[in-house]
Each structure stands twice: as structure tokens, then as C-alpha cells.
From Swiss-Prot:
<comment type="similarity">
    <text>Belongs to the paxM FAD-dependent monooxygenase family.</text>
</comment>
<dbReference type="Pfam" id="PF01494">
    <property type="entry name" value="FAD_binding_3"/>
</dbReference>
<feature type="binding site">
    <location>
        <position position="115"/>
    </location>
    <ligand>
        <name>FAD</name>
    </ligand>
</feature>
<dbReference type="InterPro" id="IPR002938">
    <property type="entry name" value="FAD-bd"/>
</dbReference>
<feature type="binding site">
    <location>
        <position position="325"/>
    </location>
    <ligand>
        <name>FAD</name>
    </ligand>
</feature>
<protein>
    <recommendedName>
        <fullName>FAD-dependent monooxygenase adaC</fullName>
        <ecNumber>1.14.14.-</ecNumber>
    </recommendedName>
</protein>
<keyword id="KW-0503">Monooxygenase</keyword>
<keyword id="KW-0560">Oxidoreductase</keyword>
<comment type="function">
    <text>FAD-dependent monooxygenase; part of the gene cluster that mediates the biosynthesis of the linear tetracyclic TAN-1612 neuropeptide Y receptor antagonist. The decaketide backbone of TAN-1612 is synthesized by the non-reducing polyketide synthase adaA via condensation of one acetyl-CoA starter unit with 9 malonyl-CoA units. The FAD-dependent monooxygenase adaC then performs hydroxylation at C2 while the polaketide chain is still attached to the NRPKS adaA.</text>
</comment>
<feature type="binding site">
    <location>
        <position position="43"/>
    </location>
    <ligand>
        <name>FAD</name>
    </ligand>
</feature>
<comment type="pathway">
    <text>Secondary metabolite biosynthesis.</text>
</comment>
<keyword id="KW-0285">Flavoprotein</keyword>
<keyword id="KW-0274">FAD</keyword>
<dbReference type="GO" id="GO:0071949">
    <property type="term" value="F:FAD binding"/>
</dbReference>
<feature type="binding site">
    <location>
        <position position="338"/>
    </location>
    <ligand>
        <name>FAD</name>
    </ligand>
</feature>
<dbReference type="GO" id="GO:0004497">
    <property type="term" value="F:monooxygenase activity"/>
</dbReference>
<dbReference type="InterPro" id="IPR036188">
    <property type="entry name" value="FAD/NAD-bd_sf"/>
</dbReference>
Amino acid sequence: MTPPILIIGAGLSGLTISRILTNASIPNIVFEASTPDRSQGYAISLREWGYTSLLTALGDLPLRSLTRGVAPDRILGGTGWIDQALRDNHTGNLLVAPDPEAKQCIVRANRNALRTWIADSGDEEVDIRYGHRLRSVQGSMGNVTATFDNGAKYQGSLVIAADGVHSSVRSQILPHVSPDIVPVVVYHGELELPRKEFDNLIRPHSGPSNILAGVGDGFNTPITVCNITPTHVHLDWSYSRPSTENKENKDPLYRPHVSAAEAKQIPPALLEEIASRDLARPWSQLLNAEALPTHRVFNWVSRCVSVTREDVNAAQKQGVVFIGDSWHAMPIFGGEGGNHALVDAVELAEALTGKEGNLDAAVTGYYDRAWRRCQEAVRRSRQRFFQLHRPMREWMEIAEKKKMMAAMKGVEAH
């Protein structure tokens, strides 16, 4: 019997490749350190190139199958639509309006629902072993052993590292590779509102969009819908900006080495800074000194991971291949990490299908195909954060140019 493929991590990339391999009758086991009830309830943006790749790999499923299962507003018959409009969070005025004729090319997805939907997209259950924290990986391509803290030991043909930015596999196989911290400030809050309160407070500003994007003078305050139930709406918000720290000045909100416990605490400097922003409604009604202590607030440290081709070749000789954030992590704000994780899983599964007898060639082919896409995505993600946090004068210039172009288009139409 062919040894199974061992997948470390039950996130989006791990579940996706397990589901595709399982559908192709290729033995595999997923190992996850956490318990089955772990939650990642926030929503992410799935871009057309990401969800199309996934739907095709799962048997040419229709887009409606996905949106019915994962859209934050699915209970209302929604499709995870966002208007992609930008509003001045000081005045509430619309700055950048989307093209009304543009088709929907981004789907918002509740991350918990997406993981469940992927796992359920097949006849045979995916084999997930929870409570398995990796201790070591040893061996070579075709014969590799994974040992876990609970004493379990499994032999497989290949280890797929799908265990995220802080990858245990990578830290063992490539100990010299560590995440780079991006000098940005990101605070993320989660809250729940009764449906009636949401309809009165947020809907008049957002309409049917699942994101209310507010931009300020070098900072952003998006409010996003994570999930809607019959009685409540789960929301999250972000407060983000580039760090101002340098040799002369310390930025009290830039805490790159914050502990897990400290990351859940609200620093007084955050309350003071938000109060100084003079936000318009509805941002001011959620982001204030009275409301924030009632939310679950996290200080997200933004990290990037980059590896060389020599690095992955060395890991390949030890029977390890990387997918998702384990080899190309991007900042949560402005990155497309979830989409690239899905495409990684699809492309590696395609490379492995029918080539179980030549794993080396399959893994090499996967890297040949994915390399440029992923390396360029990491580079772009760093730039995109700063592009999305412009001075207000630049946003005003962009808004004016958009108006002029729209006016010219209207004249040409007549």
C-alpha cells in the first residue's frame, strides 16, 4: 500500500489539498495542532482567479454553490458582494465610486464557513487528526516520518507544510528562514450587534455591501460583515496605518514583539489616537473609548515570509513541500494570502495527481509553476499596504480624476 501524504495544518490550504487529493482517491491525512472548535470567524476577500481555481478543482462547481455556503450575508440570499467604494471616514462622503457596470469579481467569505465548505465538497470525508502538534519531520522523498507531541508517529510519502506563517515544519527544515515584520500598525476588533441595530447603524451607509471602507489621512477604518444570523450580525473593524517609529521617535502603537496576551489588551494610546481622528458616523459609534472595551480587540503584527529556490530544493530532498503562508506569508491587510493559499493547494494537487510514483518531479513542477506568482505576490503585498494608506490629499486627487474620467465617458456616450 502506498504511504499516505501527510499534511500539516488544517487551514485553507491544508483542507483544500486534502479535499482534492481525497476526491482523486490519493491517501492523505491532515494533522492539526488545535481542537476542532477553533474559530477563525473573520471574513476574507476571494478574488475571481482564486475562487475560480478552487471551483474548477472541486469538479467545476458553480459559483452559487460557494456563495450559498460561505457568504457572510448568505442567510439573506446574499452573495458576499462588496461595492469597492472608498469613503472619507472624517466626513462620511464618498471619495471613490466603483463602476456601476463592473461585474462582481470579489466574493467575501466567512473563513469558518469556507473551511467547512471545502472539507464537505466531496463524497468521502477528509481525514483530519486534531490535537496533533508537530514535533519533528525526518526522512526523504517517498519515505518521511512525522512525530507529534502526543507521541503519535506516522510514516508517509511526502509532508506538505500547510501550517502558516509560523510553520513548525519550516522552522525545523529551514531554521534560518524567519518571518519579516512589516512596519505597520493594525488593530482588529470583533463585535456583535442585534440585527435591528445593525440595520439602523450600518446599513444606511453600507447598503448591501459587506464592507464599509473608510479611509483617512494615512489611516484606514474598514467595517466588515463577518456573518449574519437570524438575530445578530457579527462585525469586525480594523484601524491601520504605517508605523511612525524611527530612531528619534517611538510609536506607542507599533509593538512588533508583543506577546499573545498583550496583543489582546487595548493600549490607552489606541483610544487616544482614535479619539483624535474625529471620525464620522458610523465609524465614531463603533470606534470610541466606551465601545472598544466591549469588543474583542487584537493587535495584529503583520509579517511576510520569503524563501529562496535553494531553500525549497533543500526541503524537497527531505520529503517536504510548502504551500500557503508557510512559504509566502503576506500582511493580512492588503495581502492576498488566502487566495494564493488556495491556488497553491490546487496546483500542487494537480502536480501530484497521477504522479505518485515520481514525487520529485511533481514537486519540482509545482514550484516551477507557482514560484513567480508567489514571490511577486509577497513583494506586491508590502507595496499595497502603503498604497491603501495614502495622505488624504492623494485620495482627493484620485477622487477628482475619477470624476473627470466619468464625465468624459458620459460626453463620449452622447
